[in-house]
Amino acid sequence: MNALLAILINITLSLTLISVAFWLPQPNHYTEKASPYECGFDPMSSARLPFSMKFFLIGITFLLFDLEIALLLPIPWAMQYENMHMTTSTAFALITILTLGLAYEWLNKGLEWTE
């Protein structure tokens, strides 16, 4: 009896919501709202549009630091093993290499968005 009552309530609620959705006024559709927008590029135009090399370099730098975080996240679990010296030295080497690379980018003005 409980299963039949639950099914009946679900069907009634579903039909009520569907009928209310049909009776509500439809919103106005503007062409700007209906068009897809992908990261500032028009998807209907040519896909061979050039973009700034600065944008590319900052994107690659972001991906490198994202990868660094992904590589450093399991370090607390790796600290539980007996070879803790190897884990900390590897993590320190990774952070040092990425810090030196960031300093090199910064000194060569690779992170300057406008010149």
From Swiss-Prot:
EC number: 7.1.1.2
Subcellular location(s) per record: Mitochondrion inner membrane
Catalytic activity: a ubiquinone + NADH + 5 H(+)(in) = a ubiquinol + NAD(+) + 4 H(+)(out)
Keyword check for Transmembrane: yes
GO biological process, one term: mitochondrial electron transport, NADH to ubiquinone
Topology with respect to the bilayer: Multi-pass membrane protein
Family indicated by similarity: Belongs to the complex I subunit 3 family.
Protein name, entry field: NADH-ubiquinone oxidoreductase chain 3
Lineage of source species: Eukaryota, Metazoa, Chordata, Craniata, Vertebrata
Chain's gene name: MT-ND3
